[in-house]
């Protein structure tokens, strides 16, 4: 018999996360590695787990994630977004909870481009009066 799986795609900065929720005991696997092994910082682990904690389903689903692009912070945000979207498939009643917490909103903030004549996006070259 086929096992029930719920899918969600999350994005943040330049990171894209493809998330699968499978009924299980709460293991989170990111790119074939355990969550604790993949993310060193505790804050990033908390960010990833937020939607599960908010909806009260911690320990009920195994989470399998493929994430690529961006850095660790962007990847953690993308995973959070993907898990939230997958939890909507699990139970549409979760929408109000997830929406209020802001987990369903794609964070549109991106790195500002560097402009010519400047050293960075807004950093101007040092000014010399004389």
From Swiss-Prot:
| PROSITE patterns found in the cross-reference section | RIBOSOMAL_S9
The reply on keyword Ribosomal protein is yes
Q: What is this protein called?
A: Small ribosomal subunit protein uS9
Sorted alphabetically, the keyword list is:
Ribonucleoprotein, Ribosomal protein
Question: In its keyword annotation, does this UniProt entry include Metal-binding?
Answer: no
Query: Which Pfam families does this one have?
Result: Ribosomal_S9
Xref: PANTHER family: RIBOSOMAL PROTEIN S9, SMALL RIBOSOMAL SUBUNIT PROTEIN US9M
Instruction: Give the superkingdom in one word.
Output: Bacteria
Residue ranges the record marks as coiled coil: none
User: Could you give a single Gene Ontology term from the biological process aspect?
Assistant: translation
Q: Which GO terms describe its molecular function?
A: RNA binding; structural constituent of ribosome
Origin species, per record, is Shouchella clausii (strain KSM-K16) (Alkalihalobacillus clausii)
- List the GO cellular component terms: cytosolic small ribosomal subunit
Q: Which gene specifies this protein's sequence?
A: rpsI
Name the family: Belongs to the universal ribosomal protein uS9 family.
């Amino acid at each position: 018999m086929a096992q029930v799986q719920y899918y969600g795609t999350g994005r943040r900065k330049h990171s894209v996360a493809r998330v699968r929720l499978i009924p299980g005991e709460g293991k989170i696997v990111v790119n074939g590695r355990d969550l604790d092994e993949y993310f060193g910082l505790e804050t990033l682990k908390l960010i990833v787990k937020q939607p599960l904690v908010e909806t009260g389903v911690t320990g009920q689903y195994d989470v399998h994630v493929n994430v690529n692009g961006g850095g660790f912070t962007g990847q953690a945000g993308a995973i959070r977004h993907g898990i939230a979207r997958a939890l909507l498939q699990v139970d549409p009643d979760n929408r109000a909870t997830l929406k209020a917490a802001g987990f369903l909103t794609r964070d549109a903030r991106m790195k500002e481009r560097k402009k010519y004549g400047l050293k960075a996006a807004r950093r101007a070259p040092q000014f010399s009066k004389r």
